[in-house]
Every structure is written in structure tokens, then in C-alpha cells.
């Protein structure tokens, strides 16, 4: 029986990737990605469903990798994705958790400690906290900085995925806050060679001790 939550929580890689295409997703998986979020804001439901089915088949071929769908709960359930990620302003976390299978990963965006605690109390698997730094992916995002990230980490006892402006050279300061994973979009996807960029980030994260090592 596949246990997505176990795979997510025990994953030794500390880089959380994003894709809007199977081609990019496969390149990242081949480079070592084991956590990928499928995120395509402009695709209609039919196109996104088809993309999700294809991407899930690709992820399954890599064994221990997991695919998390952004926002589209119905499609995540229908295609039996490993997880769903929702923004706190988009959908009620309790309602999402009530609807999805028990083994499905549920991530919730939470910029500050109070909403992070609410997400954890609702049963979220992890919270996504940021933007840690200014980011070209979402220029309007409020920047919480390392201090704000540290406050979110201290407020919950579930993993925190840090997001926003994280690039090569910035992994260790982020992980030093206690965040479990670093989500990287533009630092990988906009690089001349996304696979090489991911490998550099994975190497940087591997040099930082895990909770089990300390």
C-alpha cells in the first residue's frame, strides 16, 4: 500500500520542486527531485486533469517520489494524487482534510504563526511559510524574512516548507530556522539548466544536518 505521508515525512531530499509540464517534471525527477507540486494557474480543469494524470504516471515511475497538486482538490482526489496544497485564503483547511483520503498529504499556506497553528490543528501535514525573501514568481507577496519564518516554525509541531526567493546560497540560512524543506520555483525553473540548478540545491541542502543527525 502506498503511503504518501510517510514518503513525504521521511524524504531525505530537502528541496520541494514545482512544475507545469511533464517534460520539466521528468527532468527534475531524473536530477533527484522527490517532492513535486503540479501548479498551472491558467489551465482549465480538463487540461489540468490530463496533465495531472500524465505527471502522476511519471512520478510513480520514480518509486518514492510524491506529486502534490496545487489548489484543485477535486482533481487531486480523482486522479489519486499523493497530496494537495491550498492557500489559506483559497479553501478551508478543515473542509479539504475532511474530503481527501486519510493518506493524502495536505499542505496549507500560512504566513504567520496563528494561521499556521490553525492549519496544524485542522490536521494539515505541513504548512508552507513565506515569502521568506522577495521573489519574482510573486512580486506582490509579503516578505516575512528569516525572523518570520522562524516564528512560524516555532509555532507548530508539523513540518514547515519555506518558500519565496530561495536560491543557491540561501538554503542553509533557511534550514537553520528549523524549516524542514525549501520550496524553490524561479531558482530552478528559470535557470538555464533546471536540472543542474536542482542538483546544486540538493547538494547544498545535503550539507546541512537533519534533525536525526543533530
Place the predicted regions along the sequence by residue.
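Conserved N-terminal beta1-alpha1 strand-loop-helix module at the mouth
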Residues: 1-93, 97-126, 141-144, 151, ...
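Phosphate-binding beta-alpha-beta segment of Rossmann-like dinucleotide-binding domains, i.e.
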Residues: 134-142
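Acidic, Mg2+-coordinating phosphoryl-transfer loop and its flanking beta/alpha structural elements
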Residues: 180-184
Amino acid at each position: 500500500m502506498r503511503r504518501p505521508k510517510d514518503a513525504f515525512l521521511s524524504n531525505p531530499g530537502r528541496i520541494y520542486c514545482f512544475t507545469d509540464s511533464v517534460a520539466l517534471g521528468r527532468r527534475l525527477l531524473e536530477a533527484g527531485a522527490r517532492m513535486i507540486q503540479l501548479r498551472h494557474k491558467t489551465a482549465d480543469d480538463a487540461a489540468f486533469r490530463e496533465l495531472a494524470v500524465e505527471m502522476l504516471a511519471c512520478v510513480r515511475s520514480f518509486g518514492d517520489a510524491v506529486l502534490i497538486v496545487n489548489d484543485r482538490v477535486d482533481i487531486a482526489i480523482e486522479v489519486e494524487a499523493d497530496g494537495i496544497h491550498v492557500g489559506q485564503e483559497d479553501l478551508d483547511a478543515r473542509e479539504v482534510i475532511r474530503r481527501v483520503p486519510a493518506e493524502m498529504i495536505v499542505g496549507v499556506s500560512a504566513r504567520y504563526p496563528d494561521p499556521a497553528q490553525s492549519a496544524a490543528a485542522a490536521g494539515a501535514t505541513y504548512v508552507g511559510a513565506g515569502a521568506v525573501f522577495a521573489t519574482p514568481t510573486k512580486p506582490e507577496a509579503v516578505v516575512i524574512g528569516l525572523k518570520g519564518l522562524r516564528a512560524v516554525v516555532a509555532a507548530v509541531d508539523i513540518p514547515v516548507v519555506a518558500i519565496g526567493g530561495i536560491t543557491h546560497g540561501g538554503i542553509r540560512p533557511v534550514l537553520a530556522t528549523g524549516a524542514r524543506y525549501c520550496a524553490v520555483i524561479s531558482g530552478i525553473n528559470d535557470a538555464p539548466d533546471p536540472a543542474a540548478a536542482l542538483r546544486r540545491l540538493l547538494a547544498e541542502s545535503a550539507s546541512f544536518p537533519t534533525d536525526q543527525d543533530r
